[in-house]
Amino acid sequence: MAVYSAVAWILLFGVLASLGAQNPVSWEVQRFDGWYNNLMEHRWGSKGSRLQRLVPASYADGVYQPLREPYLPNPRHLSNRVMRGPAGQPSLRNRTVLGVFFGYHVLSDLVSVETPGCPAEFLNIYIPRGDPVFDPDKRGNVVLPFQRSRWDRSTGQSPSNPRDLTNQVTGWLDGSAIYGSSHSWSDTLRSFSGGQLASGPDPAFPRNSQNSLLMWMAPDPATGQGGPQGLYAFGAQRGNREPFLQALGLLWFRYHNLCAKRLAQEHPHWGDEELFQHARKRVIATYQNIAMYEWLPSFLKQTPPEYPGYHPFLDPSISPEFVVASEQFLSTMVPPGVYMRNASCHFQGIANRNSSVSGALRVCNSYWSRENPKLQRAEDVDALLLGMASQIAEREDHLVVEDVQDFWPGPLKFSRTDYLASCLQRGRDLGLPSYTKAREALGLPPVSHWQDINPALSRSNGTVLEATAALYNQDLSRLELLAGGLLESHGDPGPLFSAIVLDQFVRLRDGDRYWFENNRNGLFSKEEIAEIRNTSLRDILVAVTNVDPSALQPSVFFWLAGDPCPQPSQLSTQGLPACAPLFVRDYFKGSGFGFGLTIGTLCCFPLVSLLSAWIVARLRMRNFKRLQRQDRQSIMCEKLVGGVEALEWQGRKEPCRPVLVHLQPGQIRVVDGRLTVLRTIQLRPPQQVNLILSSNRGRRTLLLKIPKEYDLVLLFNMEEERQALVENIRAALKENGLSFQEWELREQELMRAAVTRQQRGHLLETFFRHLFSQVLDINQADAGTLPLDSSTKVREALTCELSRAEFADSLGLKPQDMFVESMFSLADKDGNGYLSFREFLDILVVFMKGSPEEKSRLMFRMYDFDGNGLISKDEFIRMLRSFIEISNNCLSKDQLAEVVESMFRESGFQDKEELTWEDFHFMLRDHDSDLRFTQLCVKGVEVPEVIKNLCRRASYISQEKICPSPRMSAHCARNNTKTASSPQRLQCPVDTDPPQEIRRRFGKKVTSFQPLLFTEAHREKFQRSRRHQTVQQFKRFIENYRRHIGCVAVFYTITGALFLERAYYYAFAAHHSGITDTTRVGIILSRGTAASISFMFSYILLTMCRNLITFLRETFLNRYIPFDAAVDFHRFIASTAIILTVLHSAGHVVNVYLFSISPLSVLSCLFPDLFHDDGSEFPQKYYWWFFQTVPGLTGVLLLLALAIMYVFASHHFRRRSFRGFWLTHHLYIFLYILLIIHGSFALIQMPRFHIFFLVPAIIYVGDKLVSLSRKKVEISVVKAELLPSGVTHLRFQRPQGFEYKSGQWVRIACLALGTTEYHPFTLTSAPHEDTLSLHIRAAGPWTTRLREIYSPPTGDTCARYPKLYLDGPFGEGHQEWHKFEVSVLVGAGIGVTPFASILKDLVFKSSVSCQVFCKKIYFIWVTRTQRQFEWLADIIREVEENDSRDLVSVHIYITQLAEKFDLRTTMLYICERHFQKVLNRSLFTGLRSVTHFGRPPFEPFFNSLQEVHPQVRKIGVFSCGPPGMTKNVEKACQLINKQDRTHFSHHYENF
C-alpha cells in the first residue's frame, strides 16, 4: 500500500511540474551556430563548415600548394600597376558610403576566412625593391607576411580532395554579426533583463569587450595602441575594425533593444527569454529583408528572383569565389574619408590627433581606433550614419584608394599591408580558378582577347589591360579571378562578380528554412511578412536615431539629385590628414637585458650552490677543527719568549708565509704559526754573517746571508720591528763570537741578490748528480752539466757543502734522528758542521762500492759513540733504537733488551758485554747478501739498473733472483757453468716451488743460497709488442667488465633510442603542429632530451633500492647484472642526466626566445589550450614563459634543486659536509614532485613522464618501506671503546632476524645526533657472532661528535650510551670473496674494516669444518704505522691463533719507513728478520704476519701468485681504501691481465 502511495505522489508532482514548465516561445527557435537551418544537411551553413566551390580548385600540386611566382605575377607589383589610381572619383550610380559599409556588415554576417590556419603556413608578399611605401630605403629585402587561412582537416589529402577553407561564422543571413555565432557568445552579449542586449554606462552603447567574449583586438596601425579598451561587444568578431562598421553594429544593437522594449510594453507578461527571442526573430527578418531586397539590388543593379519557397536540396554553402568577388568590389568604392553630419545637414569638422581640423574622418587612420573622441555619444554615431547616407562612394572600377591599398591594417609585425595584394594571396590560398575557367563554369561567354574583358576600359585606358597582359606573360588563361573580375567592373560589378554574388544570395535564401518569407516555419504571419518587406534601412535609422524622416533620402543606399543634405564635395586625399606610415613592431624590444639577466641568473644557480656549499663546508670544517682543538692542549703556551713575527719572502713567484723568528743560544729558529720548526740556522764560528737592510719602501726588509745556507729574507710591518730583531741578532752574533757585516740596499736589489731555497735546490741537484757520476760511473752527459753562465756559479757548485738539515732531507729523514746524527758526525771529518763534496764522496763510495766488511765496519764506527773500538750492549740498544725511530714505534726498554739478548745469544755472545768489530760482523753473517745490496738512498737520485737488479730481495713480492728451491740449485749451477763464457745472461729454469716467504708461511724449511744472476722465469713466451699488449688489455677489460658494459649498453641504447624517437618525430613527423617551423633546433633538443631525462630520472631510483639489490645479488641475475656497481651506476646516470638537463634547458632557452618573438597567431596554433588568436598579435614576454607558466616555473625550480643536489653530492663537499649532502639529497622528493608537475601541463605534448616513472617509483617506495620498517627500531649499544688513531669501536645488539654476510655494510643514525642523518659503515663483526660491531674513524664532524658522545661512561652499565637506528644490511663487492679459490684482500687506512669481518668469518668456518670454496686468502694491510689501527692487529692476532689450516696469509706494509732500501732500513730489516726468526713474531706488531717497510709493489706480487697457484685461472682481488691505492691495484691487475695467463678480477671501494 505504501508503494502505491509513493507512485501516486510521484505522478502528481510530475504533472504539476509539467504544467509549470511551459515553453516561453511557441515556435522552433533558430540556433545561433547555423545548425539545422537546412534539414537535408544539418551541417550546411554552420559555423566551422567548409566553403563549397563553384569551380574546381586550382593548386600547384592539385592538393594544397598555391600557385606562386613566376607562374603568377608578384601581387604587390600587380596591385601597383593595375589597381592604383587617384581618389575623388564619385560612383557612377551614386551609391552611398553607407551601402558600402553595410555590404561589409553583411559579409561579416555571412563569411569569415581571415582566421589563420594551424599549423601556421605563410604565403608572404615580396615587396619590389624601392617600393615607395614599404621599401623607401631600397633595401630589397622587405617581405610582408601573409598567413594562410584555416582549412578543413579532412581535405587537402589528394587531388580528388583538395584543401577547402572553413567559414568561422554561420553561412546564413541569420544576424550572427548581431548576436554572435554561438549560444555562449550570445549569452555574453545579453543582459538577461527585458530581453535586451547588455549595454554599458550609456544605454546607447554595448558594454566593452571582455575576456569571455573573444573579440578581435588588432592594434591600431596609426598609434600602435592595443587591448580591449574602447572596443565594443558585438556579434561580429571584427565588428570594431572601423568606426563605420562600429556605427552599423551600434545601429542594430539599438534596434534590437528598441524592439525588445516595444514588445515588453505590448506584452508585459512575457519573460526575458520570450522577449529576447521575439525581438531577435524580428531583427533577423528585417536584416534579411534589407540585405536581400534593398541592399543587394543596389549592389548588383539586379533584382533577385521571387522567393519560390524553401528548397531543402539546395546547398547554400558559401563559395570561395563569392568571398573574393564581394569583398573586392566593395573595396573599390571605399572613400579616403567619411563625412559626419547632423539632422540639419550640417557637416561637422573632425579634430585630428595633430590638433588640425579636417572635413571628414580619414579612413586609414581609423582602423581599430580606440575611444575616438568624436564617437563617444549616441549623437556622434548618428552623425556618422547620416554622413555615410549622404556621402557618395568611390567609383566602381578597378582602382582602389591608398587608404585600402597601401595602409590597410597589417598582420604580424607590420602595421600596414597592401589589401589588394593580400586579397590576391587569399585567392591563391583558396585555390581559386582562373578568370577564364570561372566564366566558363558559370556559363558566361568566353573571353579570348584582353580587350574583351572590358571594352569600355580598353577604349578609355587601354594601358591598364596591356600592363596586366604583360604581367601575366600575355597568357589570358593565367589571369586570376580577382584581377579579371575587377577589370570587368565599370559602374557596376562585371558579369562574373554579379553572377557569383547573385547565385550565392539566392541559394542562401532558398536553402534556409528559417527565412522570414517561409510561411511553413511558423515564424511570421502573412501580415507580419508584409510588414517586414515594407521595412527599409531608412526606417531603422529613423527609429533608432529619432531624426526627422525628411533628413534622409528614401533609399539610403543611393543619393540622387534632389535628395536632402548633399555632400560638400567628393572627398579626395586633399584636405585630409596624411596616413600614419608603416612601422615594424619589435616583439622583443626592451626584453634583451632582462632575458640575458634571467639566463645569467639560471647559469649562476650552480655558482650560488657552490658558494653555499663552500660556506657550509668551511663552517663544518671550522666546527670540526674546534672539536679537534678541544681534544688537545693549546699550543699557544709553547710559544718561545722573544719571538718576532714577520713574513718570509721565498721567491718572486712564491707566496710569502708568516713565520716567528726565535733567537736561541747558538742558533736561530724559524717556526710557523703552529710552532712547527721550518728552519734552524746554526751560529758557529768562524762564520761570516752578512746583514743586508732595505733602504726604501718603508725600510722594513731584512736579508740574513749565512755561508753555505740559503738566505733568509724577512718582511716586517714597520721599521721598528726590523730594527729590534737586528739588534738582537747583533747581540747573538757577538755572544757566539761571529763576525758580521752590515749594509743597505734598495729592496729590489736586495731581493735580486738573495739566494732562495729554490736556487739552493738547483745547486744541490747539480752537486748530487756529479757526486753520483763519480761513484756510480754514470756518463757525464747523463749527470747533467754545471751552470756555465758565470764562473762564480761553477765555483759555488764545486765548493758546495751540505748542512745537517740538507743532508737529512737528501736521505728522506729527520735532522734530529740518531741515524743522521751518527752518520753526519762520522762523515764530517773537519767538524765544521757541513759536509763537503769530498767528505760526502768518501762515505758514499763505501755504501755504493764497498764490501760487506767495509759496510759493517762503517756501521760499527757510527755507533761506537765513545770511540774505544768496542760496542757495548747499551750502545747496541741505542743503535737498535735509532733503527726503529723511523717507524714511530716506541718499544719498551725491556723489549729492546730482550731483542739484544736474543741476538747476542743466537750468535754465542751471551757472556760478552762488549763486541769487537769482528764479533759485530759475525753477528751479521746470515745477512751478508743484504749488506752486499745495501746502498745509501738519496732523494731524487736514480740508481743504475744494475744496482736495482742487485737490490731486489728474496721476497714473495718479487721474482726470485736466487735459485728458489734446493732441487733447482744444481740445475742452475750446471747451466751457469755452461754459459759462463757466453756474453748472454745466465738463465735459470722456471721454479714451481713457492717463493721463500710464502713457503715460510706454510711452515716449510728455507734453505739459503748464494745469489745467482738469471732471467725471470716464464711459463710461456711473453709478447712485448705494444699492439699485442693493448689487445690483451682490451680483452681483459672486456672480460672484467662485460656485465657492466652490457648493462650500460642496454641502458644507454634505450636512452638514445628515446632521444632519437622524439627528435625524429619533431624533426620530420610533427609538421601538423607547426612547432618545428617555429623552433626546429630548440624543440628537437628539448623534446629529445626530455624523453631521455624522464627515463633516467625514473630508473635511477632502482640503483638506490638497497634491499632489492641485496636480494637480487643472491639470484642468477647477478651473473648478468653487476649489482655491486649500483652506486657507481647511480653516479654515472646522474652525471649523464645533468648533462642532458643542461641541453634540455638550452633548448628551452631557444624556444622561449623564439616564442617571445612569434606572433600570437602562430602561438595559438602551437598552444591552442593556452592562447587564443584575438588579433592582438603581441606574444607573451620572456618572463611569462619562465615564471608565469607551470612548466617554466617548475623548470626554474628544478634547475635550482638540481644545482643544490649535484654540488653538495660532489665528492669534495660530500667528504667535508656529509650532513649537507644528506639534507640536500632529500630534495629528491621535491624534485620528483616538480618533475611530475612540469610534464603534466601538456604544453607541447601529452604527459609521458608517468610511463617511465610509475614502475620504478612503486619499487622504490616498497624498498623504502622495508627499510623504514626496521630502521626506526632503537638498538642498544653494548660496548663503546675509544681506540687510537681516532677510531671508535661500537658493539651493539643484533636485532632479531638480522642476517648478513661478511663484507656487508649498514647505515646507522645516532639518536643523540639526530634521527634522520644516517651514515654508512662496514660491519667488522662476523656473521656467527651474537652482536654487531663497527669501527668508525673520526674523519668528519659527525664521526668526531660520535666519538665524544661514546666516551667511556662512569658506570658499568650501557644504559647511558645513546641508542642507534640501524638500516641494512646491504651488499658490496667484497661479499664475493668466497666465490674465488684464491682471493687477495687489500686494505689501506680505515678501508680494512670490511676485511676484518671476512677474516673472522673465514677462520670460523674453517674451524667448524664448513665447506668453503675459497682455499687461500692473502690479506695485505697498508698502514702508515703499525700503531694506526691497533684494533685490527688484535683481530689479526685472533685470526692467527684460530687459523689452524693456514688459510690466511697476512702481510703488513708500514709506509712511514723510508721507501728505498738504504743502510738504516737494511739494518732495521736485519733486526726485524732476526726477531721473527727467534720469536716467530714481528718486532713491530707482535704478530706472526710478515712486516714490510714501504709500499706494496702489486704487479710483482700478482706475478708471483701465478707461480704459486699455477692451476688457478681466476683470482679475486678486493681492495678498499683511498682512490690512489685502489687505482694502483687496478693498474697492476690491468698490466697482469695483458698476459694471457691467470685472470685477476678486481673489485674496489673507495672511502
Curated annotation (Swiss-Prot):
Membrane-crossing residue ranges in chain numbering: 597-617, 1045-1065, 1081-1101, 1137-1157, 1189-1209, 1227-1247, 1249-1269
Protein's cellular compartments: Apical cell membrane
Annotated metabolic or biological route of this protein: Hormone biosynthesis; thyroid hormone biosynthesis
Regulation: The NADPH oxidase activity is calcium-dependent. Peroxidase activity is inhibited by aminobenzohydrazide.
EF-hand domain ranges (all copies): 815-850, 851-886, 895-930
Ferric oxidoreductase domain sequence ranges: 1087-1269
Membrane topology of the entry: Multi-pass membrane protein
Keyword check for Calcium: yes
GO CC annotation: apical plasma membrane; cell leading edge; cell surface; endoplasmic reticulum; NADPH oxidase complex; plasma membrane
Enzyme class: oxidoreductase
Tissue distribution: Expressed in thyrocytes (at protein level).
GO molecular function: calcium ion binding; heme binding; NADH oxidase H202-forming activity; NADPH oxidase H202-forming activity; peroxidase activity; superoxide-generating NAD(P)H oxidase activity
Record text on subunit structure and interactions: Interacts with TXNDC11, TPO and CYBA.
Family in the record: In the N-terminal section; belongs to the peroxidase family.
Function: Generates hydrogen peroxide which is required for the activity of thyroid peroxidase/TPO and lactoperoxidase/LPO. Plays a role in thyroid hormones synthesis and lactoperoxidase-mediated antimicrobial defense at the surface of mucosa. May have its own peroxidase activity through its N-terminal peroxidase-like domain.
Protein name as catalogued: Dual oxidase 1
Source organism of this protein record: Rattus norvegicus
Lineage: Eukaryota, Metazoa, Chordata, Craniata, Vertebrata
Gene that encodes the chain: Duox1
